Amino acid sequence: MTETKRYALLEAADHPAALRNLPEDRLPELAEELRGYLLESVSRSGGHLAAGLGTVELTIALHYVFNTPEDKLVWDVGHQAYPHKILTGRRARLPTIRKKGGLSAFPNRAESPYDCFGVGHSSTSISAALGMAVAAALERRPIHAVAIIGDGGLTGGMAFEALNHAGTLDANLLIILNDNEMSISPNVGALNNYLAKILSGKFYSSVRESGKHLLGRHMPGVWELARRAEEHVKGMVAPGTLFEELGFNYFGPIDGHDLDTLITTLRNLRDQKGPRFLHVVTRKGKGYAPAEKDPVAYHGVGAFDLDADELPKSKPGTPSYTEVFGQWLCDMAARDRRLLGITPAMREGSGLVEFSQRFPDRYFDVGIAEQHAVTFAAGQASEGYKPVVAIYSTFLQRAYDQLIHDVALQNLPVLFAIDRAGLVGPDGPTHAGSFDLSFMRCIPNMLIMAPSDENECRQMLYTGFIHDGPAAVRYPRGRGPGVRPEETMTAFPVGKGEVRLRGKGTAILAFGTPLAAALAVGERIGATVANMRFVKPLDEALILELAATHDRIVTVEENAIAGGAGSAVGEFLAAQHCGIPVCHIGLKDEFLDQGTREELLAIAGLDQAGIARSIDAFIQATAAADKPRRARGQAKDKH
């Protein structure tokens, strides 16, 4: 059977306008095709799978009921938005998702008018949708703003800040909680769906509002009794008291895979005004048994065999930096009972699975709450414990005030194990760790290290752990150059680098993983190459020595040039009145799209070839500038 025949209905509903022309009784068939196409495509290309499988019916219902793109759908994070991309004219390009020049991993305003807000980080959707609703109200535009947020996203403090604000504004906002963690309990069935339809209907809504005005004004006692009765009825089927107290009309929970219930309820809610909250229960990985059984494993996948019962095993090889961290954490925890492990909902990604199993009483997953994670660690440190916060570079940005105010200002011994530093690859600019050196370097009391290989990563983690103050070790995604970590742990002398290659003319100062490429270039041009190790404090003695014995200095880092490690070197040399030319190689003042890590390093000029080009050009430029200076010097000598 050809793809056209297998996905005939999906092809006919390639845009929301065409979808809305379909008879409602054809939508279950469309859902089946959409789920099948999503499975087939992602199994070939890789990508985020389980979340999207769980939102197929919800996505169809939203585009069927609301007039997108005039009505705004804001998807929180965006992992669950693959069905949305398919139904908004991007089906043919789905195989390119997360690839260089392909579809973005997340909703992206530059990609489609149906992506009304760019996302990638969690818990932002309610704030954005509320802003859109208020903007529309100011211009008297009759649009609907809908935020779709998962139960994980709702653990983020920003989501509750937005909920608190929305309830006070009486904005025309609908929030949909996509609850895919709890199983569908017995009360989420026919009775609950029926009651949700009634409670969201026009008749009930009008009676409720009329009763509020009439009884509330003339018979407040009767109104209070009626209100309590209503809450009692709602309480039998919905855990919505919190949202009602915040000023929302709460409906649900309803079955997120029942298209009839979804469409009826959404139509009713579309016709209401003010802040509304709909609780929808879905199953992550819906329709594909292995993903339903293990949604965590199938959250983000590479290419895999649909007929297999499990994902392919990764090829054996040297450990990734994440695995090096996970092993060190367990080894250190066995030696020091003061060690505590903290993660903001990234147990698997940050390498804490084994630690959580071996030391469950010392493992804390705080949810998507980076600000809380950092101050929580500060509180533990203030009581004599040694917390380790395992966090992605891009997510540490969300806790910057806490890093300064609660940790560094009090000089508390919190170790930050910063994963995904630098360019991360397929997830694109929302997940790149391009700025951590820049935003940490200016904070007093911080100790900042960047390992060049797996063994240095292990030893730096130990160095930071025993340090009496805040420390950070930042390392990239994936594997290193293949240096096997030593079982022993030895602290590096703080603020000391090492010369790895002796040459003349040019001194290359490498910070972190670019060292391997720098050494290869240094061998070719006969340069000196230093492994700096520490971004703060810098090895000032080594920098002065190299400045005094070389014609030029080059710094290399996988971080933004602005404010990064190279900037620190330049600032120090300027303060010492050294007139030596300096070239900074790093990430330029731009956001890079998605691609493989290797592709992005090449685009950024941080692969071996790119570093060589920059250094060759710098040598030529400084040599040309030296000729007039030498000529002037020779003329002075003659006089």
Swiss-Prot record:
GO terms for cellular component: cytosol. It is an enzyme of class 2 (transferase). Transmembrane segments: none annotated. Mg(2+) binds at residues 151, 180. It catalyses: D-glyceraldehyde 3-phosphate + pyruvate + H(+) = 1-deoxy-D-xylulose 5-phosphate + CO2. The keyword Transferase applies. GO terms for molecular function: 1-deoxy-D-xylulose-5-phosphate synthase activity; magnesium ion binding; thiamine pyrophosphate binding. GO terms for biological process: 1-deoxy-D-xylulose 5-phosphate biosynthetic process; isopentenyl diphosphate biosynthetic process, methylerythritol 4-phosphate pathway; terpenoid biosynthetic process; thiamine biosynthetic process. Keywords: Isoprene biosynthesis, Magnesium, Metal-binding, Thiamine biosynthesis, Thiamine pyrophosphate, Transferase. Catalyzes the acyloin condensation reaction between C atoms 2 and 3 of pyruvate and glyceraldehyde 3-phosphate to yield 1-deoxy-D-xylulose-5-phosphate (DXP). PANTHER family: 1-D-DEOXYXYLULOSE 5-PHOSPHATE SYNTHASE-RELATED, 1-DEOXY-D-XYLULOSE-5-PHOSPHATE SYNTHASE, CHLOROPLASTIC. This is 1-deoxy-D-xylulose-5-phosphate synthase. It comes from Methylococcus capsulatus (strain ATCC 33009 / NCIMB 11132 / Bath). The lineage of its organism: Bacteria, Pseudomonadati, Pseudomonadota, Gammaproteobacteria, Methylococcales. The gene is dxs.
